[in-house]
C-alpha cells in the first residue's frame, strides 16, 4: 500500500455510522501525488500527499 514518503500517512480505516448507529467499514485515503523531490541531494520519484506539498515541507524538482 502506498504511503506519504515524508509524513508516513497511509489509508486509515474506521466505521461509517448510520442514523440507527449501525456500522460498516470504510476508509479515508490521503491525496497522494507522485512527485520528484531531492533525497540526499539526488532527485527521486516518491509519493507525497497534496497536503505535504501545499504546506511547503517539500519542493518539487523539475
Curated annotation (Swiss-Prot):
Region listing for Disordered, in residue ranges: 1-27
Cellular component terms (Gene Ontology): ribonucleoprotein complex; ribosome
Record Gene3D superfamilies: Ribosomal protein L28/L24 (2.30.170.40)
InterPro entries reported in the protein's UniProt record: Bacterial_rp_bL28, Ribosomal_bL28, Ribosomal_bL28/bL31-like_sf, Ribosomal_bL28_bact-type, Ribosomal_bL28_sf
Keywords recorded for this protein, A-Z: Ribonucleoprotein, Ribosomal protein
Biased composition, class Polar residues, residue ranges: 9-25
Pfam families, sorted: Ribosomal_L28
GO aspect biological process, one term: translation
Similarity field: Belongs to the bacterial ribosomal protein bL28 family.
UniProt-recorded name of the protein: Large ribosomal subunit protein bL28
Lineage, uppermost ranks: Bacteria, Bacillati, Bacillota, Bacilli, Lactobacillales
Primary gene name: rpmB
Amino acid at each position: 500500500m502506498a504511503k506519504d514518503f515524508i509524513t508516513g500517512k497511509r489509508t486509515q480505516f474506521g466505521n461509517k455510522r448510520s442514523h440507527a448507529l449501525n456500522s460498516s467499514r470504510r476508509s479515508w485515503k490521503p491525496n497522494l501525488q507522485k512527485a520528484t523531490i531531492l533525497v540526499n541531494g539526488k532527485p527521486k520519484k516518491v509519493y507525497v500527499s497534496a497536503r505535504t506539498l501545499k504546506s511547503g515541507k517539500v519542493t518539487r524538482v523539475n
